[in-house]
Amino acid sequence: MRVHDIPINGYCGEGFDAVRTEFERNFAERGEVGASVCVYRGGEKVVDLWGGHVDLERAQPWDENTIVIMNSLAKSMSALCTHILIDRGAIDFDAPVADYWPEFAQAGKAGILVRHVLSHTCGVIYCDAAPPGSWFDWPVHIAAIEAQEPAWEPGTNGAYNSIN
């Protein structure tokens, strides 16, 4: 589908044309069906774009009020916050996680670096000891992460994980 065939609406402030260009490329080159993006800078909305369709049949247009599930949003926010802390010198990308969380070093995890966690190469991809529902019981889930052995040598393999 050509980009001019895809309904794209909204606002893109001065100096943010590159955001609109990439947004359009998602449809034209990357097979996006429907999406939206909103960016605030200094408390001001500078980008508010939406386009495409809600359904694969491309029958229902995506609008500014389309609601979607945001999977794994915490990962990007965690990475953003961690990079801010790195930039401020509060965390070292190449330091062991155990420098900041000593109990994490249990079960062969002493060599896992901050970079391994952020790049999904730490090897801690699940928690054998995590009982059902422990996501909602902070001390229990943290203890399960601390007790978990890595599935591989940190930094040697990568896999999506849902514990960070």
Residue ranges of predicted features:
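Short, conserved catalytic-motif segment at the N-terminal edge
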Residues: H4, N9-M70, A90-D92, A143, ...
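Residue-level signature of the cytosolic catalytic core of signaling kinases
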Residues: C12-G15, T66, F93, A110, ...
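Generic alpha-helical secondary structure signal
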Residues: E14, A18, I112, H116, ...
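Hydrophobic (often cysteine-bearing) scaffold residues that line and stabilize catalytic clefts
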Residues: G15, V19, M70-A74, S78, ...
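Residues at or immediately flanking beta-strands
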Residues: G34-S36, P96, N157
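Active-site helix/loop module of the DD-peptidase/beta-lactamase fold
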Residues: E64, I69-L73, L85-A129, A147-E149
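Catalytic-site signature segments of enzymes, centered on catalytic residues
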Residues: I67, Y126-N164
